[in-house]
Amino acid sequence: MQEATIAAIATAPGAGGIAVVRLSGAESYQVAARVFCPANAAKKVEQAKGYTAMYGTFREGDEAFDEGVALFFRAPHSYTGEDVVELSCHGGNAVARRLVEACLAAGAQPAAPGEYTRRAFLNGKLGLTQAEAVMDLISADGRQGAALANAALGGALAKKIDAQKQELTAIQAHLAAWVDFPEEDVPELDDDHLHRVLSGVKEELDSLIRNYQADTILREGVDCAIVGRPNAGKSTLLNLLAGFDRAIVTPVAGTTRDVVEQAVQLGDVRLNLFDTAGLRETEDAIEAEGIRRSWKKLEEAGLILAVFDGSEPPTREDLALAQRCAGRPAIALINKEDKPTRFDPELIAPFFAMVLPVCCQEEGSRRVISAAVARLLGTSQIDAHAASLSGQRQLSAALRARDAAAGALDAAAGGFGLDAVSVCVDDALAALCDLTGENASEAVIEQVFKRFCVGK
């Protein structure tokens, strides 16, 4: 059944230079002809060739309400694989909404969230991993995160997985022939070759899985708790990383009583910073609640920046904080290095991945912290142009495929017979097909595209 022609605003809402309304479907040119009048009367919208543009006015009935440009794309050479017309009007909600309403009145249907990319997937213009990369690219905040998404959109992951599928398919074909046609005298698989192929597939999947956490941080950022006792310099650190005075800084201990939030871009990593209340014993009920929230943020954070006052000896609260950071992705910052140091970092070093002397009032410390964060989170080692996994769906499929490949290796090494190896190889192939979307159910497709906004 032919899909309805759909319309939606494809650009972000709000004031801007232009807004784009996208039409896709078999009736796109006819709908466009009812709302767009070319300035050159000799030109006909329905006859426009692909990859061409026209200037004219947008109309609703007999009334012209704006002027702009129409871009034309003929199927299958378009984003969705269908006839597509993109109408560029002046930016602003009122004009763009009116243009959409005119398109709907002319016969189009409202687009659902992600429907354009969904159609691109269903029409074979994008694989499922590439469709997911579209959303990652839209959401990317940092350069490396955008590069990872762009690599996936270009097919880096799909190509890597297809290569592993080809290796396993060749093995499976040989196994099937050997098991099913014994009368044909099919030679048994060479053990060394079997081990080499299965090990190679497992190692490729292991590499993708190992890098998943760092790749995800580059794409999505990480929650970062700034913790320490009062007046250690937590709010000063927040302001340094934010690049402006986000938090109030005073000499009075306990100034910060609630969690102060601020998203910052530190190098290629987006940090969702949480400046917490100073950790100390208190009789003040309000401050005590702030301290409880501080400990909670520490437990939940994907990164901890623990700030210590380097101008004073370590206190009981400092040592308690250090112990709570043990085994977590935590960096100790010995603040106030511009003053005489009385803090012995060796007392807390066993509990942290790194201990850094800093001055939270100096820009140089921001660069030091940025480099340390990238090292700790593993983002500095990531090749942003290589294949990478994105999201729990892809990770789960990769884990299943890796475990099945490992099972095939164990079956071969344990002498369980080629039938057992064949079952494991089948499982690995099925998981890889799930990853690339070849076996994707309607429920999986719905889950992928519900993350998209209307217009994409």
Where are these regions (language model features)?
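A glycine-rich (often HGG/GG-containing) alpha/beta subdomain
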Residues: 1-147, 151, 155, 331
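C-terminal-of-GTPase-core extension/linker across diverse P-loop GTPases
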Residues: 2-9, 13, 143-265, 282-284, ...
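Switch I (G2) and immediately adjacent beta-strands of P-loop GTPase domains
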Residues: 55-65, 70-74, 254-282, 300
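Short glycine-/small-residue-rich Rossmann-like dinucleotide-binding loops
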Residues: 242, 277-278, 302, 309, ...
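Short, Asp-centered acidic motifs that coordinate Mg2+ and/or phosphate
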Residues: 271, 303, 331
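Generic enzyme active-site microenvironment
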Residues: 273, 307, 333
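Inter-motif core of Ras-like GTPase G domains
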Residues: 287-311
